Amino acid sequence: MDQFLPFSRPAIGDEEISAVEKVLRSGWITTGPQNQQLESEFCATFGCKHAIAVCSATAGMHITLMALNIGPGDEVITPSQTWVSTLNMIELLGATPVMIDVDRDTLMVSASDVEAAITTKTKVIVPVHYAGAPLQMDALREVAKRHNLPLIEDAAHAVGARYNGEWVGARGTAIFSFHAIKNLTCAEGGLIATDDDQLADRLRCLKFHGLAVDAFDRQQLGRKPQAEVVEPGYKYNLSDIHAAIAVVQLARLPQLNARRKALAQRYLTALEGSPFLPLGLPDYPHDHAWHLFMVRVDAERCGIDRDQLMERLKEMGIGTGLHFRAAHTQKFYRDRYPQLSLPNTEWNSARLCTLPLFPDMTDADVDRVVKALSSVVESLRVSR
């Protein structure tokens, strides 16, 4: 049998290993100069005014919602077709997530659906860039401006994506993930990009105990050692070990994303006319980051359902993923919002299957996956 092919694998090389070794030998391994370099180079790369590195995108979402004073009685509009962390943060702050449906093919929210969900209790809109494709930001910004609401982009999937020629994160506020499977990874980490000066100041405070400065500021930059807690905060800072990896990955991102794009195009060409339905591409100008390559497995079209296909592929040495089971179908949210019906979300949630896609894959790996999909379909035809 061929070697097992996972659905994702981090593209870590000698440069990342050397960067980590350098930090370990430096005597300063927690938040410090590598964080500062990461934030500075992220701003230079994507044109954002402020970049605040954090230990995860979830942490970034938490303190961003906190900084906007989200709490009991407030509503936050966001899709259910996303990872549950955003919904969890909204709930943990005592607010109510208003989950809306997504486009059946792109899995992203529309400005019209967002606007229809706005009430007097709405305090923030959190749309999600999906699988590497950017949202149609102009229309969403118009809705947010019309109703005087902050717009916080969940850009966990979208580092290196562009909408209408503009990098995701270049303006407004966007939250990125550097988790192990992301296009830019440092194992665990995240970053908040914003052009709001006051928000940036509060985020830096909230991410580190509510202190105005961190340990590196105090010990290395000669700032006042008696830092004061100005409000209760969290321990959401990123270590320099992680930041050093992210700095290298940021420099490599154009090449890493280009390889993802080439692999995705190979999939799209090979799967044309097959019963497996890739996600639709946005019909507006964009540059796709190809974080994930997903197909929808409809039992009527394919002769097999999603879960059965994933098991068959596993037996053939091919890993797959599910991104994601809709949040409102999870037990906590199902019990809490039993009447919620989101047809497009539910249709996709039952059929989504993530196929292997990572920069170190070969063209032959893609061909192997496509051949496996074809053989499953053919075996079902023969057995009928």
From Swiss-Prot:
Record flagged with keyword Iron-sulfur: no
Pfam families, alphabetized: DegT_DnrJ_EryC1
Molecular functions (GO terms): pyridoxal phosphate binding; UDP-4-amino-4-deoxy-L-arabinose aminotransferase
Pathway: Nucleotide-sugar biosynthesis; UDP-4-deoxy-4-formamido-beta-L-arabinose biosynthesis; UDP-4-deoxy-4-formamido-beta-L-arabinose from UDP-alpha-D-glucuronate: step 2/3; Bacterial outer membrane biogenesis; lipopolysaccharide biosynthesis
Residues the record lists as N6-(pyridoxal phosphate)lysine modifications: K182
GO cellular component terms, semicolon-separated: membrane
InterPro entries: ArnB_NH2Trfase (IPR022850), DegT/StrS_aminotransferase (IPR000653), PyrdxlP-dep_Trfase (IPR015424), PyrdxlP-dep_Trfase_major (IPR015421), PyrdxlP-dep_Trfase_small (IPR015422)
Catalytic activity reported: UDP-4-amino-4-deoxy-beta-L-arabinose + 2-oxoglutarate = UDP-beta-L-threo-pentopyranos-4-ulose + L-glutamate
Keyword annotations of the record: Aminotransferase, Antibiotic resistance, Lipid A biosynthesis, Lipid biosynthesis, Lipid metabolism, Lipopolysaccharide biosynthesis, Pyridoxal phosphate, Transferase
Quaternary state and interactors: Homodimer.
Alphabetical list of NCBIfam families matching this protein: PRK11658.1 (NF008658)
The family this protein is said to belong to: Belongs to the DegT/DnrJ/EryC1 family. ArnB subfamily.
Protein name as catalogued: UDP-4-amino-4-deoxy-L-arabinose--oxoglutarate aminotransferase
Species the sequence originates in: Serratia proteamaculans (strain 568)
